[in-house]
């Protein structure tokens, strides 16, 4: 996935689409699966409701 898929540009502002991993910190994004968010680096998993 390219970096452009992690951010959304609207006019002069840039917003982050994906969440950062709370364990690894900024720069490591969580993968968005059907029922969970997962970090590929440390294995952190957060289930969706």
From Swiss-Prot:
Keyword Chloroplast: no
Stretches of the chain forming a coiled coil according to its record: none
GO cellular component term, pick one: ribonucleoprotein complex
Keyword flag Cell cycle: no
GO process terms (BP): translation
Pfam families recorded: Ribosomal_S27 (PF01599)
Zinc finger extent (C4-type): 21-42
Cofactor: Zn(2+)
Residue ranges of the TM segments: none
Single Gene Ontology MF annotation: zinc ion binding
Subunit annotation: Part of the 30S ribosomal subunit.
Family membership: Belongs to the eukaryotic ribosomal protein eS31 family.
Matching NCBIfam families: PRK00432.1
Protein name per Swiss-Prot or TrEMBL: Small ribosomal subunit protein eS31
Taxonomic path: Archaea, Methanobacteriati, Methanobacteriota, Stenosarchaea group, Methanomicrobia
Gene from which this protein is expressed: rps27ae
């Amino acid at each position: 996935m390219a970096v452009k898929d992690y951010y959304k540009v609207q006019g002069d502002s840039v917003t982050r689409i994906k969440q950062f991993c709370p364990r690894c910190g900024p720069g490591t994004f969580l993968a968005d699966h059907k029922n969970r968010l997962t970090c590929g680096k440390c294995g952190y998993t957060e289930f969706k409701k």
